UniProtKB/Swiss-Prot annotation:
Pfam families: Ribosomal_S11. GO terms for biological process: translation. This is Small ribosomal subunit protein uS11c. The gene is rps11. Belongs to the universal ribosomal protein uS11 family. Transmembrane segments: none annotated.
Length: 138
């Protein structure tokens, strides 16, 4: 005997692709996470709520091309394009990670016309904590 499935959470009351675009954000924080494999750019407001994000993978880069500086530049300009339309004028930049896309993403952010109050490197550095993984032998 099968149980009847309730239709409480039907598709009719689910938002389809509509975002909160009416919010005006004069100041925000741009987080750049640059690893060797990918670069993720997230734009938040001052309280930390995500406004826009993009990565090299979502911009169409696949495989080893995701870690390139050009992919990071494309991801940064995609993430910033939406927040410039919402009225962002000033921003703080926090860069994390050792990847190749650090400088390229910062260059794209500078070119976007947003005034940068400061650029901070927030890469986590261990104070001799966990043992690192063994070195690769290629």
């Amino acid at each position: 005997m099968t149980k009847p499935i309730s239709r409480i959470g039907s598709r009719r009351n689910v938002r389809i692709g509509s975002r909160k675009s009416g919010r005006r954000i004069p100041k925000g924080v741009i987080h750049v996470q640059a690893s060797f494999n990918n670069t993720i750019v997230t734009v938040t407001d001052i309280r930390g709520r995500v406004v826009s994000w993009s990565s090299a993978g979502t911009c169409g880069f696949r495989g080893t091309r995701r870690g390139t500086p050009f992919a990071a530049q494309t991801a940064a300009s995609n993430a910033i394009r939406t927040v410039v339309d919402q009225g962002m004028q000033r921003a703080e930049v926090r860069i994390k990670g050792p990847g190749l896309g650090r400088d390229a993403a910062l260059r794209a952010i500078r070119r976007s016309g947003i005034l940068l109050s400061f650029v901070r490197d927030v890469t986590p550095m261990p104070h001799n904590g966990c043992r690192p993984p063994k070195k690769r032998r290629v």
